[in-house]
C-alpha cells in the first residue's frame, strides 16, 4: 500500500479515452480505455498513453505559481537538452561514464572553493539525490567519528545525541530516528525563530556527536548564527574539554550567502565546521534532484564509511544511501556553474532577493499583515495577520489564494511558538517582479471579502494546508 493516500479514497475505474486519442482509428480509442489501478492487458499507442498521462497531470498546480517550494522550477532549454542526452547515464557507473564522473569531481572542487575549504583541490565530497540524503551522510560521519572517540563506552550505556534548532528540516529528525541518535532541540523563544548559540552549547555533553546550524531556516528564511555557535562551542571546549563539531545545513543558503553575503563567516573559514551540504535543485538552480555534501578534510569523513565497489570493470569509491541514480542532474549542475559563474549567480540570486524584499514590503503596506522576516537573507519571508485582524486567519488566506492558482503554505510554528501561525513566500529564479505584482493584485482583491467574514473559517488547521518544509 502506498504511504501517501492522497486527499480522496481511490476507486478502481477505467480511464476515459477521447476517440481522437486512437491515432488513425477513432473507434479504437474508445475500446482501449485502460484501468487505473492494475496493469492493462495490452499495449496502447504511444500518443494515446501520452495524452492520458498529460491530461491527468493538468490538474497539478502550476509550478511557477508555487510559492511553497524551494525547488528549481525553471531552467534554460539548453540545460534540458543536456539532461535529455544524459537520461541513460547511471551516476554509479563511473568507469563506463568517466566524463560524467569528472564533472561531478569538478563540481565538488568548485563548491569547496566557494565555501573556502582549506585545500579545495583535495576536499572530500560527493553528489547526492538531494540535500536530505546529504544531511544523512553528514550525520553518519558525525556519529562514526563520535563512536571512534568513544569506542570504550559505545555501544554500552553511552547514547549519542545531536543538537539542533526545533526549526530543522524533517530529514534531521529522520536521521536521528533511523540511526538511533537522541535529538536535542533548541526551542523558539519570543522573536527568535531559530537556534540560539549559547542554548545549543548548553545542551552539549560528552555524547554529543555534533551541532547542526541551518543556513537558512525553512520556517522564515533567516540564517542561524554559525560563527556565534562556533564561538560558544570553542568556549565549551576550553571549559570542559568537550570538542563538538558543527555541520552547516546550507540546503538553500549555501548557494545564496557566498554571492550576496560575502562578509558573513559561516563556512570552512570556521575551523569547527566539519561539513556542509547544499541542494543543487534549490538555489543551485538545477531541476530536482541533486544535492552535495562536502567535508573539510579526509579526517572529517571516516574512511570506513566509504565503500569501494568493483563493478563493471572499475574500482569505485562510493558514499551514498542508494546505488543507481541518474547522472543528468550532475551534468546540469556543471552546466549551470559554467553558464553563470560567480557574477551570474550573484545577479540571479540578487534578483530573487530584490523580488522578495520588495514583495514583503508591499504586503506589509496592505495593513492587514505583520512581517516576521523580510527576505533579506534567504529570498524567503514569513508573515502573519496583524493584531487587529480578527475576521480571518492565515489559513483562510492560503485557501483563497489557492483558488487563484497561488500555492502559499500556512502553518503553525513549533515549540515554544505554537501560538504563531504564518504564511511563507519563497522567491526563486523564474518568479519575476511581474509575477509578484500579479500576486499582490490577487491578494488585494481577496481582502475586502475576507474582512467581511464573521470569523476565521478554518476549523481543522491540519487539513487546511500542507507544509512539507
Language-model segments: which ranges?
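N-terminal entrance/gating region of PLP-dependent enzymes' catalytic architecture
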Residues: 2-6, 10-122, 405-406, 443, ...
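Generic, well-ordered alpha-helical scaffold segments in large soluble proteins
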Residues: 106-114, 141-145, 175-182, 203, ...
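Short Gly/Ser/Thr- and Asp/Glu-enriched loop/turn motifs at secondary-structure junctions
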Residues: 120-122, 157, 373-380, 418-420, ...
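Conserved PLP-enzyme active-site core in the AAT-like
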Residues: 129-307, 312
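A generic structural motif
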Residues: 217, 339-342, 387-389, 429-433
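PLP-dependent enzyme catalytic core of the Aspartate aminotransferase-like
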Residues: 236, 417-469
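Active-site C-terminal subdomain of aminotransferase-like
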Residues: 251, 259-262, 266-379, 384-388
Amino acid at each position: 500500500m502506498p504511504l501517501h493516500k492522497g486527499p480522496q479514497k481511490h476507486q478502481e475505474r477505467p480511464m476515459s479515452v477521447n476517440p481522437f486519442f486512437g491515432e488513425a482509428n477513432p473507434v479504437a480509442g474508445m475500446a482501449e480505455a485502460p484501468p487505473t489501478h492494475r496493469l492493462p492487458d495490452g499495449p496502447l499507442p504511444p500518443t494515446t498513453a501520452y495524452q492520458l498521462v498529460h491530461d491527468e497531470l493538468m490538474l497539478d498546480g502550476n509550478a511557477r505559481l508555487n510559492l511553497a517550494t524551494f525547488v528549481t522550477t525553471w531552467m534554460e532549454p539548453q540545460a534540458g537538452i543536456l539532461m535529455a542526452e544524459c537520461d541513460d547515464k547511471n551516476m554509479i557507473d563511473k568507469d563506463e561514464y568517466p566524463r560524467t564522473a569528472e564533472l561531478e569531481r569538478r563540481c565538488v572542487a568548485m563548491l569547496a572553493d566557494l565555501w573556502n575549504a582549506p585545500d579545495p583541490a583535495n576536499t572530500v565530497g560527493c553528489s547526492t539525490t538531494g540535500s536530505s540524503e546529504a544531511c544523512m551522510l553528514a550525520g553518519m560521519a558525525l556519529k562514526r567519528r563520535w563512536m571512534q572517540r568513544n569506542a570504550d563506552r559505545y555501544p554500552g550505556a553511552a547514547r549519542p545525541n545531536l543538537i539542533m534548532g526545533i526549526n530543522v528540516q524533517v530529514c534531521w529528525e529522520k536521521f536521528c530516528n533511523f540511526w538511533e541518535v537522541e535529538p536535542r532541540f533548541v526551542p523558539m523563544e519570543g522573536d527568535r525563530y531559530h537556534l540560539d548559540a549559547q542554548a545549543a552549547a548548553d545542551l552539549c555533553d560528552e555524547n554529543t556527536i555534533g551541532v547542526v546550524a541551518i543556513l537558512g531556516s525553512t520556517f522564515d528564511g533567516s540564517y542561524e548564527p554559525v560563527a556565534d555557535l562556533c564561538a560558544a562551542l570553542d568556549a565549551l571546549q576550553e571549559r570542559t574539554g568537550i570538542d563538538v563539531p558543527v555541520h552547516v545545513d546550507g540546503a538553500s543558503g549555501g548557494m545564496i550567502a557566498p554571492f550576496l553575503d560575502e562578509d558573513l563567516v559561516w563556512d570552512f573559514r570556521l575551523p569547527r565546521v566539519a561539513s556542509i551540504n547544499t541542494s543543487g535543485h534549490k538555489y543551485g538552480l538545477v531541476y530536482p534532484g541533486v544535492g552535495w555534501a562536502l567535508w573539510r578534510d579526509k579526517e572529517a569523513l571516516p574512511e570506513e564509511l566509504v565503500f569501494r565497489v568493483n563493478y563493471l570493470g572499475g574500482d569505485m569509491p562510493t558514499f551514498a544511501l542508494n546505488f543507481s541514480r541518474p547522472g543528468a542532474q550532475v551534468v546540469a549542475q556543471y552546466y549551470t556553474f559554467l553558464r553563470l559563474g560567480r557574477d551570474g549567480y550573484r545577479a540571479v540570486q540578487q534578483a530573487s532577493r530584490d523580488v522578495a524584499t520588495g514583495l514583503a514590503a508591499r504586503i506589509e503596506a496592505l495593513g492587514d499583515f505583520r512581517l516576521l522576516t523580510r527576505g533579506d537573507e534567504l529570498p524567503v519571508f514569513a508573515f502573519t495577520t496583524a493584531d487587529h485582524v480578527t475576521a480571518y486567519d492565515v489559513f483562510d488566506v492560503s485557501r483563497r489564494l489557492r483558488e487563484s492558482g497561488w500555492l502559499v503554505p500556512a502553518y503553525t510554528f513549533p515549540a515554544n511558538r505554537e501560538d504563531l501561525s504564518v504564511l511563507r513566500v519563497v522567491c526563486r529564479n523564474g518568479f519575476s517582479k511581474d509575477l509578484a505584482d500579479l500576486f499582490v493584485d490577487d491578494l488585494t482583491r481577496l481582502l475586502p471579502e475576507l474582512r467581511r467574514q464573521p470569523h476565521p473559517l478554518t476549523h481543522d488547521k491540519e487539513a487546511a494546508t500542507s507544509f512539507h518544509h
